[in-house]
Amino acid sequence: MADSENQGPAEPSQAAAAAEAAAEEVMAEGGAQGGDCDSAAGDPDSAAGEMAEEPQTPAENAPKPKNDFIESLPNSVKCRVLALKKLQKRCDKIEAKFDKEFQALEKKYNDIYKPLLAKIQELTGEMEGCAWTLEGEEEEEEEYEDDEEEGEEEEEEEEAAAEAAAGAKHDDAHAEMPDDAKK
């Protein structure tokens, strides 16, 4: 597109004329089946003929409700809408081609990587412990071990206190020492 087309005309009549010219250009390039864009938009047979030639997605196959709004638009606007739809179809075809080529390229390079990944797997093998660790890992392991040891010591103290309490109940009630005195 030229820069003058991107800027847009200053008057609405110029905009309509520019849009109509663009629509006619698209119709001529797109291989319209003769006639002007008004007859192509209003003729359901020509639209069905175009749709039968192109493969359709399930969304395109779904029945489309008649919209009174579109039918109430002027013919020049209908022509622009038709031109935009055709341009969108072209864009969709290009995008589909890109996706297919991209998938083929991914597959090609995945096949190239397979031997390398197999060698890496062979060298690394299964997860094995190694003789060295990173400094951060050592600190984390020490903290974890300290927490476990503290937890075990607390459990042992609680068990000892529970046993002492059970033994004290069996002994004379006056012989008990307060908890503060035991420590």
Swiss-Prot record:
Stretches assigned to coiled coil: 81-107
Biased composition (Acidic residues): 135-161
Keywords: Coiled coil, Nucleus
Transmembrane segment boundaries: none
Chain residue ranges for the region called Disordered: 1-71, 135-183
Keyword Nucleus attached: yes
Biased composition (Basic and acidic residues): 168-183
InterPro entries reported in the protein's UniProt record: NAP-like_sf, NAP_family
Annotated organism of origin: Pongo abelii (Sumatran orangutan)
Protein name: Nucleosome assembly protein 1-like 5
Cell compartment(s), UniProt: Nucleus
Composition bias, Low complexity: 7-21, 28-49
GO (cellular component) term, any one: nucleus
